[in-house]
């Protein structure tokens, strides 16, 4: 990762990015020396507060993931019953966004907006391919770490869906109960 500031600042930013990449909120499966190799394929990007840098449904972006180094990112999406975005998560330093779009080349599944000025390290699909060609073992470990993160999110979403299904069933039963009670309490229809 290169920046336009002094060499000492660049080295510190590089090391911070590598440390954040190994944090539990990112890719805990990578060792620090492996993270340093990955970070060498990333490029820094400043994103102004209020900027949506990943748009849900966008199929035409360059395909990248971002490691948040500083600032906060709001992840949101449009649900079936809403026209306004629903905030899914607020992420800070050490968090990754965009991993799905990096690997699957499909339309983005959520939007990401900088809620503050954000500094992040970007890994593009082309840079990932170069990493895999130059360091296949580290590239494979990176992809496995990304897959593990995505699997954990999938499990979390499955738990939430089970909870929502139970809630919907309970609400349906309550609605039936009160509907039957109201029908029994209503006066008989006039002839």
Question: Which residue ranges define each predicted feature?
Answer:
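Cytosolic regulatory regions built on CNB/CRP/Popeye-like sensor folds
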Residues: 1-191
């Amino acid at each position: 990762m290169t920046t336009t500031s002094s060499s000492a600042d660049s080295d510190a930013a590089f090391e911070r990015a590598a440390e954040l990449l190994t944090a539990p909120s990112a890719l805990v499966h990578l060792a620090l020396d492996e993270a340093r190799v990955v970070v060498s394929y990333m490029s820094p990007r400043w994103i102004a507060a209020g900027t949506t840098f990943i748009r849900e449904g966008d199929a035409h972006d360059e395909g990248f993931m971002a490691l948040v180094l500083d600032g906060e990112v709001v992840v949101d999406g449009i649900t079936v019953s809403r026209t306004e975005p629903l905030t899914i998560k607020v992420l800070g330093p050490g968090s990754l966004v965009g991993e799905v779009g990096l690997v699957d080349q499909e339309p983005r599944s959520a939007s990401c907006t900088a809620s503050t000025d954000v500094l992040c390290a970007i890994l593009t699909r082309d840079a990932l391919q170069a990493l895999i060609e130059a360091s296949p073992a580290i590239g494979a470990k990176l992809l496995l770490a990304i897959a593990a993160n995505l699997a954990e999110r999938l499990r979390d979403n499955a738990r939430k869906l089970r909870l929502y299904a139970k809630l919907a069933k309970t609400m349906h039963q309550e609605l039936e109960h009160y509907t039957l009670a109201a029908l029994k309490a209503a006066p008989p229809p006039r002839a």
